[in-house]
């Protein structure tokens, strides 16, 4: 008996697995491990996230030089959750509350500065959501009709959109919904 254990300990290649065992963990276990990795990788504070985004910008060469980056990161290290500034080595507060200098106008300007979506992008997004909603089991067509009203463009584009959704509904065996869509299409034309 000791010969077999010594042989297994020395040469693990001779050990065979059972037919159902595999090297990789199960799908559910991989999902749990990925979720844990995301939680650990995300960090617990916004400070870490902002510092990491600055490092990414630095790596791509679009933003801040290293000397300024270090000073900006050092500025973030002294804040606690309640807004009091602290010395890096101690937990004693140094000054008063820190306030933000952003106004509502700044946020509006940033939102308008971002690139607006084109009609095609909006319509493609609506179509993707519609197909997803069609495939769901249930008779809640109000949400689908609301999304169809959001389609942008001339009537020819809307007509093509309706026709493609009718085909998808027919493919998903939604006969009653196809009837409703055809009625709406006739009213639109």
Curated annotation (Swiss-Prot):
Keywords: Nucleus
Localization per record: Nucleus
Tissues/organs with expression: Testis specific. Expressed in cancer cell lines.
CC terms in the record's Gene Ontology section: nucleus
Keyword Membrane attached: no
Pfam short name (any one): INT_SG_DDX_CT_C
Sequence similarity: Belongs to the CT45 family.
Protein name: Cancer/testis antigen family 45 member A5
Organism: Homo sapiens
Annotated gene: CT45A5
């Amino acid at each position: 008996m000791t010969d077999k254990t010594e042989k297994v300990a020395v040469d693990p290649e001779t050990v065979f697995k059972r037919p159902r065992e595999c090297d990789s963990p199960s799908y559910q276990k991989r999902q749990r491990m990925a979720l844990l990795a995301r939680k650990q990788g995300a960090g617990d504070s916004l400070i870490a996230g902002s510092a990491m985004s600055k490092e990414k910008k630095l790596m791509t060469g679009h933003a801040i030089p290293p000397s300024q980056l270090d000073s900006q990161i050092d500025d973030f290290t002294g804040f606690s959750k309640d807004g009091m500034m602290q010395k890096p080595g101690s937990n004693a507060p140094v000054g008063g509350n820190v306030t933000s200098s952003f106004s509502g106008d700044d946020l509006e300007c940033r939102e308008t500065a971002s690139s607006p979506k084109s009609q095609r992008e909006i319509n493609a997004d609506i179509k993707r959501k519609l197909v997803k909603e069609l495939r769901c089991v249930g008779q809640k067509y109000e949400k689908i009709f609301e999304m169809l009203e959001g389609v942008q463009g001339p009537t020819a584009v809307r007509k093509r959109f309706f026709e493609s959704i009718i085909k998808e509904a027919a493919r998903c065996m939604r006969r009653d919904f196809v009837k409703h869509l055809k009625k709406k299409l006739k009213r639109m034309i």
